Amino acid sequence: MLRRKRERRNAVKENEMVIDTPLEKRRTPGKPRATREPPISVVITGHSKGSEDDLISFVWRKVKVRLMNISYSPASVTAVVKSQDFSRLNGLNGAAFAGDHLAIRRVDGASNVTQDYRKAKTKRSFRSVSAPSLSALATQAQRNVSKTLPQSTNETIEKLRQFLQTRYQPATKFLDLGNLQQDPLLKQMGILAEASTKSKMFPALMKVASLNFPDVISVSLSDNNLQSVTAVTTLAQTWPKLLNLSLANNRITSLSDLDPWSPKTKLPELQELVLVGNPIVTTFANRAMDYQREMVSRFPKLRLLDGNSINSEIIASQSTVPFPVYQSFFDKVETEQIVNSFLAAFFKGWDENRSALVNQLYSPNATFSISLNASNVRTNFSQKTDTKKWGAYKMKSRNLLYSQSQKESKSRLFNGHEEISNAVKSLPATAHDLSDRSQWVFDGWNLVLPSVGAAIKIVVHGQFEEPQNKRLLRSFDRTLLILPGGSTGILIINDLLVIRSFAGSLGWLPGQSSVRTSNNAMSASASKPSDIVQPRPEQAMLDTRQQIVLKIKAETGLNDYYAHMCCEQNNWDYNSALASFLELKSRNVIPAEAFS
């Protein structure tokens, strides 16, 4: 009883102390509370060849630092970062960015945002325990900027929409953004009066335009005093399929002024460009071909430059590869007959009865493997659903992306009739249509292997359907090694199948320099010699020159490039090429890299 009375008296005293004692005396002593450091203002230069979005993305990707309250101009970028992030951001000093190198420095003295932070800090009541968030400060700073505009945000957006409406021609899908400084409506808005609002005007204009005029195909940016396209780089993001663009009567001086749009992904469809009235036109006044070549290298589909058609040779050089595009290749007519006959029977058996095919055409010691390439470059032919049905192939693929260990990879190399038969039966049903030879490429040549002797290597590029998957199309590459033997006269000892997303057959359509192809219809029986298309004259010439190059390589030890150059400079005469080589070698003027 006495103990309970003592406890009640003590509790009453403690309550009285809590009520009477000031707040600061009631707090128990401990570690001082951590205070948040104010944000740091920075200035970034060396960014002029990239856009504001490019810079923000680059910094976040490299060091995971967010740039806030950004003021962007071609000369410099000012921004604010968290105090704890500055050291990471400073690590990007000298980093390569858009063809230049970034320079980052801390600004001495408090920025507007830092001052806002400190004012907020001094106004804290004793009950506040945390500093205002950086996002709140950035929002406040943005409000301060918006106060320079005479209209509210909604009113500004509406007036920008009205301005664009007066400049847009819906019949031709043409938007005239020329001479913006002299536009009465923009002058009335005051949006171009100060640098702080002027730098943000064009991105805002593009945002409004993208929402109201998404189908624009032609734009004029003439008479805007542009020294580079950095300030208007968001145009390419707004209309990436733009066809016609005028930059006439600006101050673009060099090719580097166009670099923000130089990546071929920025304006890939651009067909006409006007630069008349810019200093760069004077720079290339006597070099018309170089001028066109430089512009086409930046805009691959360009066909008109300053009203002049692009030279056909320049267009051709952009769409060709160093070597001609070939279709099917066979070292001998006999090889072509064997391969055509074999592949017709092979794909027929693969589509209809794989188990019987394996027992009939595969060697008892044959190996079979699958590799899935689900990340190949997709084209307009690719189907949206093709990546959703890779499961059966992933389970068998030896691709390192789908094989978790060496043991698992080894288990997916199938050997002998039983393993191969079980593997191929688990794959989706297919249908190979061999009637259209333009959809296929067959290569075949003879070789001698130490372990098995004479063999033929076959490489196939083509496509097939999966009838059970709504006739889904796939592209594939297949490499087969065949030997004479078995009941059919041919045995497969190695079969490698690579499956890809459907990409069509444009990759091997013949160009002007391509060699002949065999258009023989595929059938189960071999073609007759009279049906074989005879080589064209240009094919014979290519074969002869190739033989000369190979002989020079064997005789001199030159690599492919220098051997070809040696033959070409001597008009493809073997004796002259060899004599020229010996003379140059005696004078010790052939570089070492010619033999690497």
Swiss-Prot record:
GO terms for biological process: poly(A)+ mRNA export from nucleus; ribosomal large subunit export from nucleus; tRNA export from nucleus. It comes from Schizosaccharomyces pombe (strain 972 / ATCC 24843). It is found in: Nucleus; Cytoplasm. LRR repeats lie at residues 215-236, 241-262, 263-282. The modification Phosphoserine is found at S128, S130, S133. Residues 283-338 form the LRRCT domain. Keywords: Cytoplasm, Leucine-rich repeat, mRNA transport, Nucleus, Phosphoprotein, Repeat, Transport. Involved in the export of mRNA from the nucleus to the cytoplasm. SMART domains: TAP_C. It comes from the Eukaryota. GO terms for molecular function: RNA binding. InterPro entries: Leu-rich_rpt (IPR001611), LRR_dom_sf (IPR032675), Mex67_RRM (IPR040736), NTF2-like_dom_sf (IPR032710), NTF2_dom (IPR002075), Nuclear_transport_factor_2_euk (IPR018222), NXF_fam (IPR030217), TAP_C_dom (IPR005637). Pfam families: LRR_NXF1-5 (PF24048), NXF_NTF2 (PF22602), RRM_9 (PF18444), TAP_C (PF03943). Interacts with mlo3 and rae1. This is mRNA export factor mex67.
